[in-house]
């Protein structure tokens, strides 16, 4: 009978082990499975590839309903799709004067948004525009990010750098690794870029801290902390996923501004015949 008890105990033990292993393999609801990611020769996560945001932050970082666009002749082409907030708490903590300025920007989007004039988009806006961007990790550890929109680019220096000599559209980026997360600090901005088409803006005191964390072979978690003591009452965050483009022939394509932008920027210099209607005044409205 002793050998029978031994068999029974063995069977129970095997069944218990199998049950536990099945429980371990089943991820808890809301838990992201641990997926092995590829790495570079020096052991850092391999972020190389073409990535793109798929949400509506480009139109408005906060919750917003669908609405018609400001240029009536473009119909649905310039319409704004509904979207959910990527801002932590759905609140951008503007100082009172800045909140009024943001409202003015929103109401005068077509004449104020730097994107309309095809200027460089700045950071973090370049990351979540409806165009892909490419990450290239170089042999000397510096990282190049190239954006399809406006053919913009920036080099992320992985070593300590001197303060930026001048303010620029894309700022000066310095990176470091925090475990498997790429952390990028960018300063040295001018005050000419916006965060979206809803008029959210900043000053030249902007400091952007980005965190890129690879969650799976085709998914990056993108978290941004925005600080600007001249405009906001406190730092605030945005967060969204970035997806790897799976097209077999994925690549960044050429970018060209549409022709009416030239009219918007330089139309006042054209010789008038008396028959023209002012572009911004005659054709623009918000609902």
Please give the residue ranges for each predicted region:
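PEST-like low-complexity, intrinsically disordered acidic/proline/serine-rich tracts
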Residues: 2-287
């Amino acid at each position: 009978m002793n050998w029978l008890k031994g068999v029974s105990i063995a069977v129970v033990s095997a069944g218990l082990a199998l049950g536990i292993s099945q429980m371990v393999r089943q991820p808890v609801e809301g838990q992201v499975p641990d997926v092995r990611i590829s790495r570079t020769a020096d052991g850092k996560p391999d972020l190389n590839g073409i990535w793109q945001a798929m949400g509506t932050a480009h139109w408005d970082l906060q919750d917003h309903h669908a609405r018609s666009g400001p240029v009536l002749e473009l119909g649905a082409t310039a319409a704004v799709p509904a979207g959910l907030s990527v801002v932590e708490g759905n609140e951008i903590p503007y100082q009172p004067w800045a909140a009024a300025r943001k409202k003015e920007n929103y109401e005068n989007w077509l004449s104020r948004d730097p994107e309309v004039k095809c200027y460089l988009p700045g950071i973090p806006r370049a990351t979540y525009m409806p165009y892909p961007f490419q990450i290239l990790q170089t042999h000397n550890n510096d990282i190049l990010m190239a954006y399809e929109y406006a053919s913009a680019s920036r080099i992320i220096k992985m070593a300590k750098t001197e303060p930026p000599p001048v303010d620029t559209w894309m700022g000066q980026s310095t990176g470091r690794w925090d475990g498997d997360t790429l952390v990028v600090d960018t300063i040295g901005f001018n005050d000419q870029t916006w965060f979206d088409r809803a008029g959210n803006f900043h000053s030249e005191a902007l400091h952007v801290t980005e965190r890129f964390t690879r969650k799976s072979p085709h998914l990056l978690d993108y978290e941004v902390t925005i600080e600007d003591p001249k405009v906001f009452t406190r730092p605030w965050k945005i967060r969204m996923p970035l997806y790897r483009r799976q097209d077999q022939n994925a690549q960044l394509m050429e970018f060209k501004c549409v022709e009416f932008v030239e009219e918007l920027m330089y139309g006042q210099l054209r010789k008038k015949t008396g028959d023209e209607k002012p572009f911004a005044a005659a054709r623009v409205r918000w609902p």
